[in-house]
């Protein structure tokens, strides 16, 4: 393949519309990247090569007749293996779900398919999208972690095995692997993207979001995921320069020098482009956030896995077992207090960060650490 990848998903779709690029060319490029790197990186659980080529040919025929299904027409994507794709297994990185074939698309997948996306296959996740490491390796240094739990999605996008991928986040499972693998990730506003057809961890914390090569691609993916094939993916024009709210405490304090320098450089670049800057402090309620988050996640995980864990506990990874055991031993009053604190912290942050303000903070305190 001797063509350069388009700079954005929208640019690729425009090239397909003009006949300068075909969906089959994009799929072939992704499959070539898999052939080069997958044996070392282990980003994919399964790839439906024949199905992807069939989808590409069908979408190419439509494009030649001037018919585009939507903003993702002909774009190859990966889907994290906790999200249902009709006819593919959803195993969530666990032997307990081995061979569990989805009978229908999750709503978020159905929206992407209706918008013209080509579903290449399922990407690797840590077990039940929790803490036990996956077999995926960091694409830039095999001795360092790719981050989890959306390990495969981030690595696949980084190496051009797909133009975008679905991930999920309960704590940092989109933003962390995206940062470690040098790509972009978006945790959407809670509830803006449906989580039906997704293996849950915590119904109070789970999000489905995109991983892609750029913020522009995240916007295109998110618009379709939230609003469907008819979504307006035009990048909005800003009437006034945006305001940057730099959260100076905790995140920047925890960051190492390299991450801190990159964050400051990014803020400076935005300032030079016309943005306004303000320093903000985290609310008092932040002090308990990590403990309350752990409480919610543990109890919700225990509720989700209650019956299976009782009969097959030994089949769970050690870190998932620890989480579930914590949830089983948590008092009801502590869980209720954690839910109340979640509501309080959300209100406190909304008072600090308005919708027209960009919060600036490192995605992770360090670059990808050595190890799994």
Regions found by a protein language model. Give the residues of each.
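A short helix-breaking turn/cap at a secondary-structure junction
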Residues: 187-267, 284
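An N-terminal boundary/leader segment
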Residues: 1-54, 272-274
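Acidic/His- and Gly-rich active-site-bordering loop/insert found
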Residues: 52-54, 62-135
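Short helix-loop capping/hinge segments that flank enzyme active sites or metal/cofactor-binding pockets
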Residues: 72-92, 241-243, 295-350
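Acyltransferase
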Residues: 23-28, 57, 258-281, 306-311, ...
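Short, surface-exposed loop/helix-turn segments at secondary-structure junctions
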Residues: 95, 99, 136, 291-293, ...
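Short glycine/serine-rich loop segments
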Residues: 104-222
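Glycine-rich, small-residue loops and helix-cap segments
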Residues: 19, 30, 74, 80, ...
């Amino acid at each position: 393949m001797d063509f350069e990848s388009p700079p954005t998903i929208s640019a690729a779709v425009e090239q397909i519309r003009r006949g300068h690029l075909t969906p089959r060319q994009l799929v072939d490029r992704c499959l070539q990247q898999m052939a080069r790197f997958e044996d070392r990186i282990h980003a994919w659980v399964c790839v439906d090569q024949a199905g992807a080529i069939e989808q590409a040919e069908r979408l190419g025929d439509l494009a030649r007749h001037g018919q585009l299904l939507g903003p993702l027409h002909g774009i190859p994507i990966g889907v994290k293996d906790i999200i249902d794709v009709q006819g593919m297994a959803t195993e969530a990185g666990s032997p307990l779900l081995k061979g569990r074939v989805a009978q229908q698309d999750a709503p978020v997948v159905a929206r992407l398919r209706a918008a013209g996306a080509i579903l290449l296959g399922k990407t690797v996740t840590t077990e039940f999208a929790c803490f036990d490491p996956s077999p995926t390796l960091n694409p830039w240094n095999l001795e360092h972690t790719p981050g989890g739990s959306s390990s495969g999605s981030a690595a696949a996008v980084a190496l051009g095995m797909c133009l975008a991928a679905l991930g999920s986040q309960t704590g940092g499972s989109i933003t962390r692997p995206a940062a470690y693998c040098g790509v972009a990730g978006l945790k959407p506003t809670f509830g803006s993207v449906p989580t039906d057809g997704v293996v849950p961890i915590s119904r109070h914390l789970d999000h489905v979001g995109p991983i892609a090569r750029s913020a522009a691609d995240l916007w295109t993916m998110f618009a379709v995921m939230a609003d469907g094939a008819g979504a307006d993916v035009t990048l909005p024009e800003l009437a006034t320069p945006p305001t940057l709210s730099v959260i100076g405490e905790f995140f920047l304090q925890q960051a190492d020098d390299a991450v801190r320098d990159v964050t400051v450089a990014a803020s400076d670049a935005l300032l030079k482009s016309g943005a306004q800057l303000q320093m903000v402090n985290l609310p008092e309620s932040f002090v308990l956030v990590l403990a309350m988050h752990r409480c919610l996640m543990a109890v919700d995980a225990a509720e989700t896995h209650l019956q299976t864990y009782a009969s097959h506990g030994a089949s769970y990874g050690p870190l998932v077992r620890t989480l579930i055991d914590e949830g089983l031993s948590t008092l009801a009053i502590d869980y209720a207090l954690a839910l109340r604190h979640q509501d309080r912290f959300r209100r406190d942050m909304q008072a600090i960060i308005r919708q027209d303000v960009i919060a600036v903070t490192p995605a992770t305190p360090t670059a990808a650490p050595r190890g799994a």
